[in-house]
Amino acid sequence: MMLQHPGQVSASEVSASAIVPCLSPPGSLVFEDFANLTPFVKEELRFAIQNKHLCHRMSSALESVTVSDRPLGVSITKAEVAPEEDERKKRRRERNKIAAAKCRNKKKEKTECLQKESEKLESVNAELKAQIEELKNEKQHLIYMLNLHRPTCIVRAQNGRTPEDERNLFIQQIKEGTLQS
């Protein structure tokens, strides 16, 4: 096979009649008709020669290479290496199994620990929410008791405050969130 540039045709595929424009009969061709084609023909011949040399070198190189049954430089046979190699692979597999089991156990313990901690925190959260509700109920009860006591309070009358003043003070204290006695 010849090396070709894209768009070029090999010399064997081209006939003389295809190279030269045939406007005249075959015997009437002159030298000038071939003069402008010589660079193309020379290039085609050069590629053909290079291709032959390349093919010849490749075939001689392939003939010189011999295939052997075992790699060069290896004096130990496969049977001698196999027991040592197999033993090493077995030990490594065993260590890997142990490490994998250890890793799985550690992961399982960590998951269980996190689950217990999550349950504990949820329990504490529920207790705190219950305590908040209890304190809110106690606050409402104390406000109710205070409102029941206000009309009969003796201390209020001694301080000189009017019921309207007491009511405004009480509303202000509720808004601030503190009840001062």
From Swiss-Prot:
Subcellular location: Nucleus
Cross-link (Glycyl lysine isopeptide (Lys-Gly) (interchain with G-Cter in SUMO2)): 78, 175
GO molecular function, one term: protein heterodimerization activity
Keyword terms: DNA-binding, Isopeptide bond, Nucleus, Phosphoprotein, Repressor, Transcription, Transcription regulation, Ubl conjugation
InterPro entries: AP-1, bZIP, bZIP_sf
GO cellular component assignments: centrosome; CHOP-ATF3 complex; chromatin; ciliary basal body; Golgi apparatus; intracellular membrane-bounded organelle; nuclear body; nucleolus
Basic motif: annotated segments: 88-110
Subunit record text: Binds DNA as a homodimer or a heterodimer. Interacts with KAT5; promoting KAT5 autoacetylation and KAT5 deubiquitination by USP7.
Described function: This protein binds the cAMP response element (CRE) (consensus: 5'-GTGACGT[AC][AG]-3'), a sequence present in many viral and cellular promoters. Represses transcription from promoters with ATF sites. It may repress transcription by stabilizing the binding of inhibitory cofactors at the promoter.
The protein's name in its UniProt record: Cyclic AMP-dependent transcription factor ATF-3
Lineage: Eukaryota, Metazoa, Chordata, Craniata, Vertebrata
Gene: ATF3
